[in-house]
Design a protein with these regions (language model features):
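Class I (Rossmann-like) S-adenosyl-L-methionine-dependent methyltransferase catalytic domain
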Residues: 1-113, 127-213
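Short catalytic micro-motifs in class I SAM-dependent methyltransferases
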Residues: 122-126
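A conserved beta-strand element that flanks and buttresses the S-adenosyl-L-methionine
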Residues: 119
């Protein structure tokens, strides 16, 4: 499988090489807010779930625990996904489809279809240039089925200007709705202040949209 190139991949490979996963500034032992929104969707166990920017997230562990059988974990960093595979172990890792790709320049994601749930915690807000944001939206629209759900969590307007040394494009629910456009209905949203492993507060906006057409 070809690897995505460019500074984002190099940055995230360095991050996952240089720190224990549970010390990273976005680590969650239990991703409760994402799970809450996912469970609201009423998905079947074979419905296709695509997690964008998986990293070494425990969300995949929890989705497997919940009995989901059609999960794709995607990240620009192969090192991040390898860390997650190692934690899951061979048997559980074999139940997940793994895609190393850049959502803004997809080589593999763009071929997916009929995704029932697009989940993104903290990818979109790293895309600060309009062409990147448009490419992200193009990928989302290409793969997510009508009637499917998009759960997006990003740094809130009141949050930090940078994460992991990179600049951030911050959002609230209105800005996310404007970004996705009128083909997406905002069904739920809430603010949540996450605390990093070192104790620093990070205000997020969590949203759940349904694709109408």
């Amino acid at each position: 499988m070809s690897k995505p190139s460019g500074s984002f991949q190099e940055h995230w490979d360095r991050v996952y090489d240089s720190s224990d996963v549970d010390k990273l500034g976005w680590w969650e032992a239990v991703p409760e807010k994402s799970l809450h929104l996912i469970r609201q969707c009423g998905l079947g166990k074979d419905d296709l779930i695509l997690d964008i920017g998986t990293g070494a997230s425990t969300l995949i562990d929890r989705l497997l625990d919940d009995g989901h059988r059609n999960i794709i974990a995607s990240d620009i960093s192969e090192k991040a996904l390898q860390a997650l595979k190692h934690r899951l172990g061979p048997e559980r890792a074999s139940r997940v489809t793994w895609i190393v790709d850049d959502v803004t320049r997809p080589q593999h994601l763009c071929h997916l279809r009929d995704v029932c749930l697009w989940h993104d915690r903290a990818v979109l807000h790293f895309l600060t240039e309009e062409p990147q944001r448009q490419a992200y939206l193009n990928t989302l629209r290409a793969v997510l089925k009508v009637g499917g759900f998009a759960i997006i969590a990003a740094f809130h307007l009141t949050g930090a200007d940078k994460c992991s040394g990179l600049p951030i494009h911050k959002y609230d629910q209105t800005l996310l709705a404007e970004f996705l456009g009128e083909d997406f209905l905002l069904e739920d949203h809430f603010q949540y202040t996450y605390h990093t492993p070192s104790g620093s507060p990070r205000p997020y906006i969590y949203t759940r949209f349904r694709r109408l057409r």
